[in-house]
Regions:
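Classical Sec-dependent N-terminal signal peptides that target proteins to the secretory pathway
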Residues: 1-9
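Non-catalytic ligand/cofactor/substrate-binding and regulatory segments of enzyme domains
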Residues: 11-132, 164-195
Length: 195
């Protein structure tokens, strides 16, 4: 179910991000975890970045070829033995386990030169830590790539999916349950090496 979620700010000072379904489309997606929480078991959610290639040609992110019409997702994870940067894990969770229903995404077009900004960020920040979790990692990468007009701002020191969802309210519409089915196979980067 594809839809748009309109924030309380719509019609006031909400901003619209330019996003055509062509070129490179960068997205930040967040899921607050509430629908997956159970009594005595809290799900804190997850946040990740997506890159959708609609350029008409193959682009490269690190050593990953992304052919036209395909996409890649990535974020840091606290997976046992793999506290690094994982690629295309989220689409697997969505397709095989029905996870992240109700996820919210904000998207904008970027230039191919911004791929270098993403790669540099990945080189410097390829690990999950308690204070630099998936939400912290994703929002800082997003802000480094998109610039001030599309930057997301949160309050407080701890970055969570719920705070990113609140930051989305600065924009007039956000996509609900974005489709990530065109992503590839799962792999990991840790200490600059692909595994």
């Amino acid at each position: 179910a594809l839809g748009l979620w309109c924030s309380a700010a719509a019609g006031k000072t909400a901003r619209t991000l330019p996003c055509k379904e062509e070129g490179l489309v960068l997205s930040i997606t967040t899921f607050d975890g509430k629908s997956e929480s159970k009594p005595f078991l809290k799900c804190f959610g997850h946040t990740w970045i997506g890159l959708d290639n609609r350029t008409g040609h193959t682009v490269y992110l690190k050593d990953r070829a992304i052919p036209d019409g395909e996409m890649v997702t990535f974020s840091v994870w606290a997976v046992s033995g793999l506290s690094g940067l994982l690629f295309d894990l989220e689409p697997c969770y969505i397709a095989n386990y029905g996870r992240y229903t109700g996820r919210l995404s904000l998207s904008t077009n970027i230039g191919e030169e911004q791929l270098k900004v993403i790669e540099d960020y990945m080189e410097q920040h390829d690990k999950w830590t308690v204070d630099k979790n998936c939400s912290y990692w994703s929002i800082h990468l997003w802000n480094a790539v998109v610039g001030e007009d599309a930057a997301l701002k949160i309050r407080g020191f701890v970055c969570t999916p719920e705070k990113i969802e609140q930051a989305f309210s600065a924009f007039d519409c956000v996509e609900v349950d974005k489709d990530f089915s065109r992503a590839g196979d799962i792999y990991c980067y840790k200490d600059g090496e692909r595994t």
